[in-house]
């Protein structure tokens, strides 16, 4: 279990730094997009890039290569983290898992309801306020330093892991284009082979990765968003639960392909993919007339993130404990839960990602992005103030 805690601390430290980098990159992208260099910025990410290999011809804009290919690697890392937590971490038992699972469910359902109540004619955007940007949220906690109880950080991480799983399910079910069933058969065949390797306890990562590339291609062709391939591959990577978890993390990595792959990709995901995604997607022209034109959509997203998230997380967990369905973690107060609920309202990169899937009209996407930025900042400020005030009360 020591190694499990070590992995969580390592995850927190990397995601925290990544969150700070994302903030800088976001400011840079918005600044460039609204400067004299804005046209070059948008032209860059509209550039068509292609691969021609035999019968394989793939051509997409640079933006789509980032959002479809690199984000599949990001979701591969997310999937690895989810599987690890479910097998040896904070989600490995019903007692441990129930509280953050219920918190995440509340933090997804209430924002979605608030959004839909305001936008019955643009219902596809309901997934935008459901998401949480774990890197940004942990970055805020890091800036607060020792004012934050370590137990709060652990709760936020486990909450975000479940939230990510929920986002994956939402993307797979609700943001799927026209389906091509013949490619489902190809994808199923490849995925069956991957699981056969897992069944045979094949420890080398190379065959999993090669087959994972084909899995991505076929899922991309099915009409399901191709990032789902990353999650499916992650769930099939073996993790040796019987390994001695008291050993050093280096030995654990050698014995466990899942941990080895997670460590190999985490820095690339946190410090290359996510900043690149933020830079490519955060550049939006600040046009308040556009926001006014789509004010109900923007308001639905804002209310979902700023109000829906904390109310959903707090009310669902409070009710669950009163009904004895779950138990609140030790050393975490209800004030902490409420404050973390606001940090859960920092949607940022994940909300931006879903906004591109939810809306085809780029003017709506631009307005929604501004709403996401403003809402995430407000939620971060409120959550931070609540945690600081709570810390001052407990100081001698």
UniProtKB/Swiss-Prot annotation:
Pfam families the record matches: Na_H_antiport_1 (PF06965)
Localization per Swiss-Prot or TrEMBL: Cell inner membrane
Reactions the enzyme catalyzes: Na(+)(in) + 2 H(+)(out) = Na(+)(out) + 2 H(+)(in)
Membrane-spanning segments: 17-37, 62-82, 98-118, 125-145, 154-174, 179-199, 209-229, 268-288, 296-316, 337-357, 368-388
A molecular function GO annotation: sodium:proton antiporter activity
GO cellular component: plasma membrane
UniProt topology in membrane: Multi-pass membrane protein
The entry's keywords: Antiport, Cell inner membrane, Cell membrane, Ion transport, Membrane, Sodium, Sodium transport, Transmembrane, Transmembrane helix, Transport
Family annotation (NCBIfam families): NhaA (TIGR00773), PRK09560.1 (NF007111), PRK09561.1 (NF007112)
The protein, known as: Na(+)/H(+) antiporter NhaA 2
Organism the protein comes from: Aliarcobacter butzleri (strain RM4018)
Top-level taxonomy: Bacteria, Pseudomonadati, Campylobacterota, Epsilonproteobacteria, Campylobacterales
């Amino acid at each position: 279990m020591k190694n499990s805690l070590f992995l969580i601390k390592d995850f927190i430290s990397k995601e925290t730094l990544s969150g700070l980098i994302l903030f800088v990159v976001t400011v840079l992208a918005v600044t460039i997009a609204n400067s004299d260099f804005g046209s070059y910025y948008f032209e860059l990410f509209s550039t068509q890039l292609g691969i021609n290999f035999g019968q394989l011809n793939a051509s997409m804009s640079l933006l789509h290569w980032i959002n479809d290919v690199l984000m599949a690697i990001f979701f591969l890392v997310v999937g690895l983290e989810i599987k690890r937590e479910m097998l040896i971490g904070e989600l490995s038992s019903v007692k441990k898992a129930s509280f953050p699972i219920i918190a995440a469910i509340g933090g997804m359902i209430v924002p979605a309801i608030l959004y839909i109540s305001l936008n019955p004619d643009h219902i596809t955007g309901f997934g935008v306020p459901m998401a949480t940007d774990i890197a940004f949220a942990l970055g805020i906690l890091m800036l607060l330093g020792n004012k934050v109880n370590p137990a709060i950080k652990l709760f936020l991480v486990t909450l975000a892991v479940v939230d990510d799983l929920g986002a994956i399910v939402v993307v797979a079910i609700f943001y799927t284009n026209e389906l091509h069933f013949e490619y489902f058969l190809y994808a199923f065949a490849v995925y069956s082979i991957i699981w056969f390797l897992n069944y045979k306890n094949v420890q080398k990562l190379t065959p999993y990765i090669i087959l994972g590339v084909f899995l991505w291609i076929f899922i991309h062709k099915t009409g399901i968003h191709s990032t789902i391939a990353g999650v499916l591959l992650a769930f099939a990577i073996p993790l040796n639960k019987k390994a001695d978890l008291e050993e050093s993390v280096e030995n654990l990595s050698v014995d466990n392909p899942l941990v080895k792959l997670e460590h190999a990709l985490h820095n690339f995901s946190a410090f290359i993919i996510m900043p690149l995604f933020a830079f490519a997607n955060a550049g939006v022209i600040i046009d308040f007339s556009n926001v006014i034109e789509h004010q109900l959509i923007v308001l639905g997203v804002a209310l979902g993130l700023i109000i829906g998230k904390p109310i959903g997380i707090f009310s669902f967990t409070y009710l669950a404990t009163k009904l004895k369905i779950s138990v609140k973690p030790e050393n975490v107060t209800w004030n902490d839960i409420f404050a973390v609920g606001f940090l859960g309202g920092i949607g940022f990169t994940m909300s931006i990602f879903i906004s591109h899937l939810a809306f085809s009209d780029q003017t709506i996407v631009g307005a929604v992005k501004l709403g996401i930025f403003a809402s995430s900042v407000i939620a971060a400020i409120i959550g931070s103030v609540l945690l600081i005030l709570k810390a001052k009360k407990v100081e001698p």
